[in-house]
Amino acid sequence: MSADSIEPKQKRLRYADANKGRKVERKNTPRFEATTGLQSPGEEEQISADGGWVLIHPTPKTMLFKEILMGELGYTEGQGVYNAIRSTEAAIRQIQTTILTNTLNATRYEDLAKDWQTHLDSRGVSAEEIAATYGMYSEGEAVRVAEQIFATWHRTLQMSLLDFVRSITACFSASEPDGTASFAKYIDWIACLGLIPLQRLKRAPGATVHPKLWRKLPTDVPSLESCVDERDLAGKLYVANSLLREGLEAVVELARCTASVAIMDYDRVNIFYHYTRREVVAIDSTTGKRGECLVLWQPIWKDGSVLFDSPLQRICGEVCNCHALREHAKLCQLLNTVPVKILVGRKKDEAQGPGWASKAVDKLMGEGEELHSSSAASRLVKLIVNMKSMRHIGDITETVRSYLNETSTNLLSGAQVDTSLPGFGQSGKTKQGGNMPVQEAFRTSVINGINGMLEGYVNNLFKTIEDLRTGNSGLLDQLRDRESEITHLREQLLRVSQAAADGSTQPGASSAALPGSGAKSGAGGLGHEVIDIRNLMGDDGYVANSFQSRYIPAYTADMERLSRLWDQELLRCFKMNRITNNQGQEMSVSYSNSSISLLLAPYFFSILRARHLGFLITHQEAYRSEEELCVAVFKKTRLEAYLTELSTLFVARVRNSIAALNSTKRDLPVNDNEAQSDEEQLGKPSDERYYEGRDRSASPQRDRGRNGRGYHKRRRFSNNYRRRSGLARDSSIRDRSQRGSRPTPLLHDHVGH
């Protein structure tokens, strides 16, 4: 079937004939889009800051919205709700429902009645034949057969028509990846800014109506009508012609709506806002073409900037804060764990400051645990120190005795010597006889010999030490002041160097550089480092931290809170419906009736301007399978009403025929002898049959008719007659008489054959 065979509707022809020759002036009624920057080409003005226009997109903030939406700053579980909102399933189901409804509603009653009569003729069945065959003595049986015959035709017709209409629906695809009126882009604009920039495309001369852009299709591309193979069905059903005509008209109309609009890309459009006139204008940054802007949620002007009424505007701050916390935690992990920093705190002995002298004396004296009694020099120095602390000359005897006890051990013990002999320091004293041990004699000789020599030397030595300690106390204070100044200068130098390093770091460098990469990494200087502070440590300084402890700020609670914010914001803003199981676990997130009205209605009526859309789908229909959707739509159309009426009339015709047969047989004579002979031959009890409306009682009074016109005879039929007539044996089926009721009135056939 070609496009020329698709004739316009009669009402459109009548409207065209009535208005032919009459000039109709169309008034430009203001649309909602006109308040958002839609202007005719002759009224376009120059967009500039002097005219009060402010660029509201692209800005760093609006581009950040898109980055957040794409997961550039992290992704949480709650953000997955946006995938359910962005799904085009609801829009596709709405388009399919529209095409199905418009197509099936185009059915004509005359065509449907012809198809039904054709079916009866092909089966060789009529209402009179059904009544004669199955309704002679059981009306219910005949009615049941008639209903089953119509149900069979109803089911086969429904399957054929739905397959036929589904092929028409397949001509239009709303999920094209290169579609200009993409539903996904429409949702992205709403989530980011709450407004949708778009362009109205003009049809090129000679272009073919196609669901894609207005363009001339190649010769090898099949036409729109070739999507439907109507040869078989159109030759068998009268109703197929009207369905095909109306179905293709619905597809062409939707194709024209989608091909005449283009939702502009997020990264290729400049949006300007005029606060005084409350207008928004969109301009393509590559072509310079101007478009209009559908404002779904009005933005707010604040101090020279615009606050958008959108989910991303409300949640952007929390996303940035959580992202900064995660970056901080990553830097802490890199700086405090890997690489390892080693802090060295040992100083040389000669560079340890004023306290070194006392420590050296302690070392020489052997007071330390590691140097206790380890060398003869330390014991000698200890002897000198002890001699300095003497209060009188007599204490030298005890000092020398203790020194000799530590050093000589048993070297001089055992032998005796006469100390009265010359050489033991007793020449000037009165000689005393007697021998003394060698050790005691040596001790006495040493004491007498070194007493005079060391006393003056030791006094002068410790006097010098006291003078040095007094002088070094002032130098120690000056040294500490200089060290504090040097520490302060080093801190300033470190801050300046860090600022210079941060400024030289590339913005795109990753903070998660590999450990040990050193200055080559994006963080700069994260290699292994040895910090030498030996020259900075004081006498009582020590290593406070070796940087081996792992410290990472916890951000799990913040991430969970951000996930809940995403979930609540998207569900409540777009009115989505959460489906859970009996345990309260989430199964899916789907469109509700409110979200369908919020999102689908502006898309089809304001963006696509589809005027013959019909009712919006419900949330149950949005997620049905294609077959279930077709069956549900089939029951809502006028075709179903026509089929119900045909079924009712056909059953009524069968009942009418049964009543006519019963009234005819009521007047026929009955031969009781012949019936009795048949029963005797079979040897079985006879089965009694009554006219409709007669009582079964054997009483003669019960056999009398209600009109009082005498008695009616009971008819007896043999089993052979029951077999010949094809009556059912089941008593529940064959016995449906109305006890004590009047005969069923005749139904006249008001429907022409």
Swiss-Prot record:
Main localization (coarse): virion
Biased composition (Basic residues): 707-726
Annotated keywords: Disulfide bond, Host nucleus, Viral genome packaging, Viral release from host cell, Virion
One GO term (biological process): chromosome organization
Source organism, top-level taxon: Viruses
Localization, UniProt: Virion; Host nucleus
Gene Ontology annotations for the cellular component aspect, listed alphabetically: host cell nucleus; virion component
Biased composition (Low complexity): 507-518
This protein's record includes keyword Disulfide bond: yes
Region annotation (Disordered) ranges: 1-44, 498-523, 668-753
Composition skew (Basic and acidic residues), residue ranges: 1-30, 681-706
Family matches, as InterPro entries: Herpes_Portal
Positions of the UniProt region annotated as Putative leucine zipper motif: 454-475
Function summary: Forms a portal in the viral capsid through which viral DNA is translocated during DNA packaging. Assembles as a dodecamer at a single fivefold axe of the T=16 icosahedric capsid. Binds to the molecular motor that translocates the viral DNA, termed terminase.
Membership in a protein family: Belongs to the herpesviridae portal protein family.
Subunit structure: Homododecamerizes. Interacts with terminase subunits TRM1 and TRM3.
Entry protein name: Portal protein
High-level lineage: Viruses, Duplodnaviria, Heunggongvirae, Peploviricota, Herviviricetes
